[in-house]
Amino acid sequence: MNIAFIVILVIFVILILVGIIGIGFYNKLVFRKKKVIDKFNAVYMSLKERVDIIDSISNIITTNKLHEDNILMELNKMKEAILENSSVNETLPLINESDDLLKKALSLDSIYDELLKDKIYMNLKDTFKNNQYKIMYSIEIYNEEVEEYNNYKSKGIANIVSKIFRFSDYSYYKKENDI
């Protein structure tokens, strides 16, 4: 056999192996990225449940003729912000903002005693607390998935493949204050 033919055959086999390995790493990166997006969607769906809580609080404020126009206006702005933003970097800060705003709105019973007798209002406080725990659990899973993705993406051949195909890092969610 001709030595040039053997060299070409070896190079061809090496290129095929590199291609197969590269495709494997690419597929794993796509799979991990999809898992991160799925976990973020779980966080986002829980955040959208807050829109229902915001609507209910707004109804209670207007029904009971409470003079809390500032809170009502802030609630409407928060609702719009949640519904308009769906990217990770825009949505994660809304969690802290909505937590603070809803805590403020749900503390109106310290000013208006009639709210303590309102069963809908009291159920709403429980619903909010459950929603907080659900979001925190979803965020914990999201952060774990982001860590796995970012770590995998930054190592060895996966790093090369991720740079070639421009896979970007995902942001972690950092809670400003605990529940």
Predicted features, each with a name:
Residues N2-I179:
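A helix-centric hydrophobic-segment signal that preferentially recognizes long
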